[in-house]
Each structure stands twice: as structure tokens, then as C-alpha cells.
């Protein structure tokens, strides 16, 4: 490393940062192909087997609990593991389970199989957190995270359209088989493309490469004990816990829309399944711009994620509230509302992860973001069976009250971080 000229180091950094970014963004979008395909298949599966909303919510909630803990423990592993093995391996195993799901029948099978799928899905994002914090300096990470975060929306939008088309023309089982085959191929491509930290490639740490970036404290470096890092930067760090609890409520809104929107739009608003897929794609695609805008604005504000998150959450509350007043048949209006909700929910969803990484430093970043994911998907668990129960007993407005009140609580928690900036 010491023999390389500054020009050579700069060239290699630019090459590897570009390769890491497009690889993990594409890779995580593929993860969505074998996780969110179930949303478009929900109604035909429920119709074929006679499931109630509560029973289908159980499929979603059990799998979400598994995903929450898988993501957390994968985060603990991700701070020490090579990202290429963890991310590519998880995608391959998830794809194989999707193939199996397509042959299934019965509530018990669907619960067990989708829970297994979500166990492997938890390996998708923690490697990305490690790569982001090791390849991009704190001054760049808001924008870099926003670019990577587009993988959520790209994957979600594409699978909503593709799975909707597959269900319409070939039946719900095709919505699991076709994405699975693509992701099997994608897992080997991902293994080839990904790398580890700059130091593993013979390059200096990003703090050294980017002039003016803060140095990491020596006692928190890679050689520090796992328990020491976890205790200092996560367990006793109140700010990581605040944003993690806020994520619990943000995910009730986000996952509620992702998992239940197709069913809601068809049953309550008179949409076809194909039109519902377009509305969900609008939600996802607008989220790309919401996350990019939130990251750029917060970087311009010196790393203050709190004010930007609160602004977005207030507008999210207003957007969800509009759903109460839109009559059935107003497809363009509903598409506009879904576009607004996507923009405003994905901004704070992304900033929560960035803030947790900021507060925990890069050597505990995957663990910290894993904690936000754990709390977030516990919220999604509440949303799964909770939405089903509310819809069965109070209609779809009951679910909207759950989402709007959750957005209010999440906004209040993020307001507590208003003046908090990253830890150097």
C-alpha cells in the first residue's frame, strides 16, 4: 500500500467504489425479488385456499419476526465477515426456498416456508452497511447511502410489476419460480463482483484517503473485542436506541403499504391487480428520490439527520391522512397519494440507518443498523397480523388509523435527535 502513488490510490479507490456501489445496489434489489413477490400473490393465494386476512397476516408476521432477528444477528456477523460470502450466500438460499414455496399448499406450509425464506433474507443488507461505512467517508455517506437505498425501491417497483404480470398470465406460483431462477444466477454474479474493505484490497482506510475526514479512535478499531464494541457503541448508546425505536413505527407504515396495498386497492378502491401493481411501483420509485433528497439535504446540513427526518415525517402523516378521503375509482388521485407516501417514508427510513451508523462509528455500523432493522421489522410484525385483525373487524380505515398514528409517534421520536450530529 505504501508503494502506491496518490494517483494510483485515487484511481483504485474510484474503481472499487463504483464497483462496490453498483454490485451491492443490484444485489439488494435482487433480494426484493424473492421477498416482496409475495405481496402481489397475496390475494390469489388467499382466494385459492380460503384464508382470512388474519390468517394471511399470520404468514407475514411470523416471517417478519424471523427476518427481524436474522437481520440483527447478520448485522453482528456483518461487522466481521466478508460481505461477498454473506450477501451472495443469503441470496442463493432465499432463491432456493422461493422455488420450494411455489410448490406449496396449506397455511402451515406457507408460514414455515416463508419464515425460512426470511431467515436467509436477513443476510442481504448488513454486508452493504459494512461496505458503505468502509468505502465512503462520513462527509459522503448520506449521499452514498441514498444511492444504495434506491435498491429498495428499484427492487420493489420491478417485482411489483413483474410479479403482477406473472400472476395475471401464469398464476401465483410463477411469481415465485421465475424470480428465484433469476436470483440463483444473480447470486453467483454477486459473489464475483463484491469485495471487502479498502484495507483488504491493499488501500488506505477511507479516513486517510479523503482529506479532512475524521479519524477513527484506535480503541474501537477492527481489533477491538466484539463485546467491547457492542457495549460501547450500541448497548449503552441512547441515540442508537432512539432511532431504532422510531424505526419500529416507520416500518409499520412502510411495510404496511408494501404488504397490504395490492389487497387494499383491489378490495377497497376498485383497482385491478395490474393497476395496483402500478400504484405500488409509483410508491417505490418515488422513494428513490425521497431517499436521495433526504441524504443530500442532511449532508448539506452537516450530518444533522434529525431535522430532515422530522420534515419528511410530517409530510408523510399528511399523505397517509389523505387516504381517508379518497373515494373508490379515483385511480390517478390514489397513484399521486402513493407517490407522495413513497417519497416521504423512504427519506426517514434511510436516514434512521445513516444516523445509527453515524452514532456508532464505522466499526459497529452493521450491528447498529442491524438493531434498527430488528426494531423496524418487529414493527412490521405488528403491522402484519395487526392489519389483518383491524381490517377483519373495522374495515380498511382501521388499518389507516394504525399507519397514521404510527407515523405521528415516529415523528415525535425523531424530533429528539434534532440537534444530534455524527460521532467521529
Question: How should each PLM-predicted stretch be described?
Answer:
Residues 38-40, 236-292, 349, 383-384:
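Extracytoplasmic gate region of multi-pass secondary transporters
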Residues 69-108:
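Conserved MFS/SLC helix-loop-helix module at the cytosolic interface between two early adjacent transmembrane helices
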Residues 80-91, 299-313:
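Cytoplasmic membrane-interface "Motif A"-like loop-to-helix N-cap segments
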Residues 148-199:
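Helix-loop-helix hairpin linking two adjacent transmembrane segments in secondary transporters
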Residues 304-355:
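C-terminal transmembrane helical hairpin of 12-TM major facilitator-type secondary transporters
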Amino acid at each position: 500500500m505504501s508503494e502506491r502513488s496518490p494517483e494510483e490510490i485515487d484511481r483504485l479507490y474510484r474503481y472499487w467504489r463504483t464497483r462496490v456501489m453498483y454490485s451491492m445496489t443490484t444485489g439488494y434489489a435482487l433480494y426484493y425479488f424473492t421477498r416482496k413477490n409475495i405481496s402481489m400473490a397475496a390475494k390469489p393465494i388467499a382466494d385459492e385456499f380460503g384464508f382470512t386476512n388474519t390468517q394471511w397476516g399470520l404468514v407475514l408476521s411470523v416471517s417478519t419476526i424471523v427476518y427481524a432477528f436474522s437481520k440483527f444477528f447478520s448485522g453482528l456477523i456483518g461487522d466481521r465477515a466478508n460481505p461477498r460470502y454473506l450477501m451472495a450466500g443469503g441470496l442463493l438460499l432465499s432463491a432456493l426456498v422461493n422455488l420450494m414455496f411455489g410448490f406449496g399448499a396449506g397455511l402451515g406450509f406457507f408460514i414455515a416456508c416463508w419464515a425460512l425464506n426470511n431467515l436467509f433474507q436477513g443476510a442481504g443488507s448488513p454486508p452493504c452497511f459494512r461496505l458503505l461505512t468502509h468505502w465512503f467517508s462520513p462527509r459522503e455517506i448520506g449521499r452514498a447511502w441514498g444511492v444504495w437505498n434506491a435498491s429498495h425501491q428499484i427492487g420493489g417497483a420491478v417485482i411489483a410489476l413483474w410479479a403482477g404480470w406473472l400472476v395475471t398470465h401464469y398464476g401465483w406460483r410463477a411469481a415465485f419460480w421465475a424470480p428465484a431462477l433469476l436470483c440463483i444466477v444473480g447470486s453467483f454474479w454477486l459473489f464475483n463482483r463484491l469485495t471487502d474493505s479498502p484495507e483488504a484490497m491493499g488501500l488506505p482506510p477511507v479516513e486517510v484517503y479523503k482529506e479532512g475526514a475524521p479519524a477513527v479512535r484506535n480503541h474501537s478499531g477492527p481489533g477491538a473485542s466484539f463485546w467491547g464494541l457492542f457495549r460501547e457503541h450500541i448497548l449503552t448508546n441512547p441515540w442508537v436506541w432512539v432511532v431504532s425505536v422510531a424505526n419500529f413505527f416507520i416500518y409499520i407504515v412502510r411495510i404496511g403499504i408494501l404488504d397490504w396495498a395490492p389487497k387494499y386497492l383491489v378490495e377497497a378502491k376498485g383497482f385491478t391487480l395490474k393497476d395496483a401493481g402500478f400504484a405500488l411501483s409509483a410508491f417505490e420509485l418515488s422513494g428513490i428520490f425521497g431517499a436521495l433528497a433526504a441524504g443530500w439535504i442532511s449532508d448539506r446540513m452537516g450530518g444533522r439527520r434529525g431535522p430532515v427526518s422530522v420534515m419528511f415525517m410530517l409530510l408523510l402523516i399528511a399523505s397517509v391522512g389523505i387516504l381517508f378521503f379518497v373515494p373508490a375509482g379515483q385511480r390517478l388521485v390514489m397513484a399521486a397519494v402513493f407517490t407522495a407516501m413513497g417519497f416521504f417514508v423512504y427519506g426517514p427510513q434511510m436516514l434512521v440507518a445513516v444516523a445509527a451508523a453515524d452514532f456508532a462509528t464505522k466499526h459497529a455500523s452493521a450491528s447498529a443498523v442491524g438493531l434498527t432493522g430488528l426494531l423496524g421489522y418487529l414493527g412490521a410484525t405488528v403491522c402484519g397480523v395487526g392489519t389483518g385483525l383491524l381490517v377483519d373487524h373495522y374495515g380498511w380505515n382501521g388499518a389507516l388509523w394504525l399507519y397514521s398514528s404510527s407515523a405521528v409517534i415516529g415523528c415525535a421520536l425523531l424530533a429528539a435527535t434534532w440537534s444530534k450530529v455524527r460521532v467521529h
